[in-house]
Amino acid sequence: GITNNALLMVSDTPGTNKTNYHTLNLKPKVRIDLDALTPGLYAEGYAALDYSFNDGKSINTPYDIYSYSSATDEYTNHKDATGAISVNSWSNKSNTITLNARIGYTRTFNEAHRIDAFASYEQSKYNYSSLSGYRTNYLSSALPDLDFGSKVDADKDNGGNSTETARQNWFGRINYGYKDKYLAEFTIR
């Protein structure tokens, strides 16, 4: 309709929409060679953190938009059809923490028999939460905070949710190779 004028939609006349994204990914890793105990033995592990926080605000402002009637030779303002001043504010955050520990062994005997094996433990935990709020019928768009919107129940809304998941597992693998011609592999999880 007339309120979806493409020229107006690419301007900030009908309002603004701003979103901020913040992300942090860390994965420190350590490896220790345990050749002093037996050649080819090692231990390694890591701790991974994936964190994100996002927030945003959209502000809808009414604007003047006219249609012309050639029958009456008059312009009609459709500002009422563009809505009232309203604000939608939201945020969400999530984090995943993963811990992994592994002990492994790699060695070749008599230049013919190669053994490569490891056993590993891993656990991961994920958390997510979100919060949102909406208000309409502001007197002005100069203070677009939720507190300054209408206090009437029909003119406001809010919501949110959260999720938490976790997992733990053990896994491992044993490889045996003979003169790089024959290979046997066993995997367990």
Where are these regions (language model features)?
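Surface-exposed loop/turn segments flanking beta-strands in extracellular/periplasmic regions
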Residues: G1-A6, T61-A84, N127-N158
